[in-house]
Amino acid sequence: MAVMAPRTLVLLLSGALALTQTWAGSHSMRYFSTSVSRPGRGEPRFIAVGYVDDTQFVRFDSDAASQRMEPRAPWIEQEGPEYWDEETRSVKASAQTDRVDLGTLRGYYNQSEDGSHTIQLMFGCDVGSDGRFLRGYRQDAYDGKDYIALNEDLRSWTAADMAAQITQRKWEAAHAAEQLRAYLEGTCVEWLRRYLENGKETLQRTDPPKTHMTHHPISDREATLRCWALGFYPAEITLTWQRDGEDQTQDTELVETRPAGDGTFQKWAAVVVPSGEEQRYTCHVQHEGLPKPLTLRWEPSSQPTIPIVGIIAGLVLLGAVITGAVVAAVMWRRKSSDRKGGSYSQAASSDSAQGSDVSLTACKV
């Protein structure tokens, strides 16, 4: 039996404490990584980010001067040097594996050495309000397309094409799913509980949305009504338009929820309406931070008809910056919770110093 290191003992104690507590709703921990080859310009660039719910808490960039996993949330800064050493070691090992895999995959697809190619990877786990394991996932993509994913049973794989079937056979022979399942159901959950406790003032808060409606004339016959929700957390929110009480799903323009840059989120939904019929339309807002859903209606006497191009442009620019920062990893992420997957990396079975991202050390394709 392996000797339990102090760090592991602390982790288990914090996990036991977490089981006596409850949180509102489910929570998740996810890691995303992206490797981009740069033929003729050195080693591939590797970026990894970790999220608890909608909050980024760690980041690594192989082009950064520090060459270390770095904190991105105040509550993670309390972790000691051993934690950061292990996280850095793990993420660098993953970068090295990706360098090898880029060459292997290029061979699988019979591609030349001239072009740039991309590997993307996502894995993580969810816990319920009682802190117990709900689900785990892992997905891999190559050049922006699905490659292989762990199935919901955490015991089998789905390969996207013939090349991915080669990887599937390798991983099945190595019992990779079993090792990954042990990580997802064990270490991943334990660290997520620890993070939720240490960062509870941030991670378990609810900021209700600030809402308003704007009116944008298109012509003498039509106008756009845009329903805004700003400054809310967590990111999950529902905006719906109704006309005379009937949902207008097909006619609604809805943008993705976007980070505001201050730890909160923004979203809007718009609908084109006949001029003079604005009062027949209502916007309905549902969010965890609201005691009950909000209903908004255009009131021309109290809300000016002013184009808000500056705000829209700012949101678009912010979205572009965020996307660039993670090299499109979040763009590839599944938008539907029932299609979740995750990225496999071999979980250590007895390494008492392993970090929360131990599975970034990937099994080669």
From Swiss-Prot:
PROSITE patterns for the chain: IG_LIKE, IG_MHC
Name of one Pfam family that matches: C1-set
Signal peptide coordinates: 1-24
Cysteines engaged in disulfide bonds, as pairs: C125-C188, C227-C283
Location (main, coarse): membrane
Region (Alpha-2): 115-206
Residue ranges occupied by any Ig-like C1-type domain in the UniProt entry: 209-295
Positions in the Extracellular compartment: 25-308
Subcellular location: Membrane
List of residues that carry Phosphotyrosine: Y344
Transmembrane segments: 309-332
Topology feature Cytoplasmic, residues: 333-365
Region annotation Connecting peptide: where it falls in the sequence: 299-308
Stretches for region Alpha-1: 25-114
Record SMART domains: IGc1
Alphabetical keyword list: Disulfide bond, Glycoprotein, Immunity, Membrane, MHC I, Phosphoprotein, Signal, Transmembrane, Transmembrane helix
Family designation: Belongs to the MHC class I family.
Protein name: Patr class I histocompatibility antigen, A-126 alpha chain
Organism: Pan troglodytes (Chimpanzee)
Lineage, opening ranks: Eukaryota, Metazoa, Chordata, Craniata, Vertebrata
